[in-house]
Structures are given as structure tokens and as C-alpha cells.
Amino acid sequence: MMAMQLSEAADVLQGRISGEDVAFRGISTDTRTPASGALFFALQGPNFDGHAFLDDARRQGAVAAAVSHRCDSPMPQVEVKDTRLALGQLGEYWRRKFSIPVVAITGSNGKTTVRAMTESILSGCGRALSTQGNLNNDIGLPLTLARLGPEDRFAVLEMGANHHGEIDYLAGLAHPTIAVVTNAGPAHLEGFGDLQGVARAKGELFARLEADGTAVINTDDAFAPLWRELAGHCHVVDFGLDNDAAVSADWKGDTGGSDVRIRTADGEIEVRLPLPGK
């Protein structure tokens, strides 16, 4: 879990401290939940302003606050230009302290299921940090990154979006080493214009990979050629049921789940999944 002095956070965020240079552990954005020892970020939105709730954050255990203007509170504060952007900056700073495989997953459908299954598989080799609930946006992802600790061997991060540039921003915080796009479908079309726009937005994840990263591409999706183009600078592993792919499978489902024979260059394996659906 994130742990540092307030002065270190201020240096990262180019902020100004008022009050004591305290040590904090973890970050919080919600005064309705416990925040023992945490740095509270006073976020603002159309219908709320976290700056009005510093006393509530303090009662929940927060020891300091990140604010966009000085507040009348005994809590030490670090003043930044934009608390929402600062939340992301601090999350990225903390993520860079860990040299572990980071799997980022997005897509119109199935990303939560794929994230949960990936976490389950990797947990057999060591502790895997994973996105909790729906914390897959520009607030939730930094909160997830802040939970990284020395005991984590992997991170599995879900990313959601409803407009262009959002996945690019999230990937810029997480620095994934492996990127997975499950598919592109007609979800949130109002934010992307059309299905091509959805596919390009999801493909921002591949474009953000470093040259030594791995893009995992669904060859059954009509936009696989576009994603291959966006991932042309890195390693690609493709998968599919209906096309020739590096990882392919035979699938048979019933009301109780699915029987799958998975084929790879290293051999085959048969698994029974207690999940309906293809």
C-alpha cells in the first residue's frame, strides 16, 4: 500500500504544504468509508465538493488532505492545481516503484469476467492485485494502484471508458506490460460516434504499450486488423474460436457451464468452466 511523507507527495504533485509534514498510508476520496492514516483527495464535481468534507475525512482517520485551495481545517494539506489530476499523478508515481507484470483489460463486454479469471489464474503463482468492483476509471484506477505493495507479484487492472482518450490516459497511469481488449461492441456509442470509434478507443490500450509489451488480440472480432496495426510496435499474441490463432479452442456449453479444449504452441489442455456463455 502507498506509504510516504506528505513532502514526497508534494514534490511529485508540485504542490505546496501547509501544516506538518506527516507520514500517510493509502489514499481516500470517500468520506463515507474508513481512511485510517490516509491522504484524502478533495475531489470536485457538478454536485459535490470534497473540500467541504475535510472534517468528515479526518473523523474517518485521514491524516492529511490534497486540496485545490487552502481549507479551514487542522489537517495538514498539500495544495495542487487540480485534485483529480493529482490523484492520477500520485497513482502513477507509486506504480512506477514496482517492476512486476501489469495486465490491463478493456473491452465493450466481458472485461470484468476476464479480469476476475486472470486474477484467479495468476494467484496460483503469487499474490495478484486486482481491480475491486467498478473502480476502473480515472478515480478508481489510481486508488487501485495505491494498493500495490511489495508482496504483489502481479497486477490485473480493468479499464473502462465512455469517450476517446480515456483509455490512453488510464494506460498512461498504469504502464501495462500486457494489454487485453476483449471485443468492441455498441456500448456507449454516444461517446465514440460509431463502432469504429469504439474500436479505436479500446485500441488506445495497445498503442500505449512499450516495445517489450504484449498485446493480446481477439481474432474473432472484426476490428482485429485495426488492433494489430495499433500494436505493430510490440509483441502480439492472438486468440480466437472462429479463426486461426496462436491460442485457439473448441467450445461446448450447457446450462451448467462450458467445456473447453485450449490449443497453444506448447500443447493442449481441457478445462471445465462453471460459467455459461461462449
Q: Each predicted region: which residue ranges?
A:
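N-terminal leader/targeting and accessory segments in enzymes
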Residues: 1-89, 93, 270
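Phosphate-binding loop of NTP-binding sites
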Residues: 87-219, 225-232, 264
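Short, charged/polar "capping" segments at the starts of alpha-helices
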Residues: 70-74, 221-226, 246
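Adenine nucleotide phosphate-binding catalytic loops in nucleotide-utilizing enzymes
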Residues: 195-199, 234-278
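Conserved beta-strand scaffold positions in the cores of enzyme catalytic domains, especially
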Residues: 17, 77-79, 102, 127-130, ...
